[in-house]
């Protein structure tokens, strides 16, 4: 009797697990991206519609398969403009939205949920995952970068954690000629400044800090007014004031 009860309990747990697994929503992209077949497993209880915009965001697990390699990435803020909360059904096949770099060298205006891009100027592309509206502002996204040269087999990827790659967003500016990455600080109605990282001896290091001073703009109502900009060079870990750009309205 006890043996039968144990078997029944195990079967019940198995059925419950299958039911829970079946509740996930599976989506597949019709095109290969950088040679990878891409599928997405969405957790249905995580869907948030219209928090910052009319695009639904949700927790998801993305899988990239190519030539015996399987890469798995988790995204807490996955979104695709092809998917809405109302139309979302398991087994859907959707078209991939290609990535386009802006003319300013930033990700601004990007609508792609993921793409491949050489973030560290080494000639090989990394996987970029879009955290939809992850900056906390309507229509502006954060990004996580992943290295993909991990060999064959199945790999649960972790994002690149070293600076500046852990704070990429729509305003991040890439300069492949000078091999610099500029990270904005205090993004909102008025930015506080930016940090500039340069490639030195094969690794990125902070080479400049830019500070925006908006104090003189408080009384200006009707004419355009820019901040006073302080440029600091970083030399052996020490900040040295390099130059000051003053707004014409700064008396």
Stretch-by-stretch model annotation:
Residues 28-30, 110-119, 166-182:
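Beta-propeller blade termini
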Residues 65-67, 138-160, 196-201:
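Beta-propeller blade repeat segments, especially FG-GAP/WD-type strand-to-loop junctions
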Residues 1-27:
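Bacterial Sec-dependent N-terminal signal peptides
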Residues 111-112, 128, 139-143, 167-168, ...:
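Short, surface-exposed coil-to-beta transition loops
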Residues 73-77, 156-163, 206-213:
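Beta-propeller fold detector
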Residues 40, 119-131, 176-182:
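Acidic/hydrophobic-patterned starts of short beta strands in beta-sheet-rich repeat architectures
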Residues 83-112, 163-172:
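Repeat-based blade/solenoid architectures
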Residues 18-70, 175-251:
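Acidic, small-residue rich beta-repeat scaffolds with periodic aromatic anchors
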């Amino acid at each position: 009797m006890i043996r039968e009860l144990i078997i029944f309990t195990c079967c019940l747990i198995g059925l419950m697990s299958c039911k829970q697994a079946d509740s996930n929503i599976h989506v597949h992209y019709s095109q290969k991206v950088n040679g990878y077949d891409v599928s997405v497993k969405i957790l249905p209880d995580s869907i948030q519609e219209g928090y910052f915009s009319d695009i639904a965001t949700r927790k998801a697990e993305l899988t990239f398969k190519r030539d015996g390699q399987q890469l798995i990435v988790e995204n807490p803020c996955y979104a695709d403009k092809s998917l809405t909360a109302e139309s979302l059904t398991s087994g859907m096949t959707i078209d991939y939205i290609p990535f386009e770099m802006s003319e300013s060298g930033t990700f601004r205006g990007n609508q792609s949920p993921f793409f491949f891009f050489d973030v560290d100027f080494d000639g090989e592309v990394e996987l970029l995952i879009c955290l939809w509206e992850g900056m906390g502002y309507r229509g502006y996204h954060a990004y996580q970068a992943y290295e993909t040269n991990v060999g064959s087999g199945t790999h649960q990827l972790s994002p690149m954690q070293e600076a500046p790659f852990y704070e990429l967003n729509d305003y991040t500016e890439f300069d492949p000629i000078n091999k610099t990455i500029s990270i904005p600080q205090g993004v909102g109605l008025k930015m506080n400044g930016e940090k500039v990282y340069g490639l030195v001896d094969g690794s990125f290091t902070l080479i400049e800090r830019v500070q925006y001073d908006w104090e003189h703009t408080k009384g200006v109502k009707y004419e355009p007014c820019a901040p006073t900009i302080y440029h600091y060079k970083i030399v052996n870990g020490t900040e040295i004031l390099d130059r000051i750009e003053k707004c014409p309205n700064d008396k």
